[in-house]
């Protein structure tokens, strides 16, 4: 099944030690064809961006960068594996690694949140 990420909102539900996002970080995804990008902010993140592609197996291959509330700039790469959960929401299982401004690697989970009505 192919997932359309356009206009989906996600929030982190778990993250490894050394990761900067938390349950206050909100991600806003966009998509055009196989191109995917997002902005994110909240928690310790003042503002961040991601850009990448949807691979043939459905995983997302992303590069990210953000500015923290303390003014630090960090970046890295992430591979996200989607899972469709209740009410057709999407959960992304992420493996990430810092490539700039930080050290280490980890895993996180972000889940789609439905907009308030």
What positions do the PLM features span?
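Short hydrophobic/aromatic-rich beta-strand segments that constitute the beta-sheet cores
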Residues: 11-12, 36-39, 60-64, 90-95
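Tryptophan-anchored aromatic micro-motifs
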Residues: 1-21, 92-98
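Short, surface-exposed coil-to-beta transition loops
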Residues: 21-25, 45-50, 73-79, 91, ...
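Short, solvent-exposed secondary-structure boundary motifs
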Residues: 11-21, 38-45, 69-73
């Amino acid at each position: 099944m192919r997932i359309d990420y356009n206009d989906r909102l996600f929030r982190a539900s778990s993250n490894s030690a050394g990761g900067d996002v938390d349950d206050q970080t909100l991600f806003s995804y966009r998509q055009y064809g196989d191109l995917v990008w997002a902005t994110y902010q909240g928690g310790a993140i003042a503002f961040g961006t991601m850009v990448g592609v949807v691979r043939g197996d459905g995983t997302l291959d992303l590069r990210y960068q953000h500015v923290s509330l303390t003014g630090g700039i960090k970046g890295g790469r992430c591979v996200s594996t989607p899972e469709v959960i209740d009410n057709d929401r999407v959960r992304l299982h992420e493996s990430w690694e810092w490539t700039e401004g930080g050290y280490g690697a980890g895993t996180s989970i972000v889940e789609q949140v439905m907009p308030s009505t």
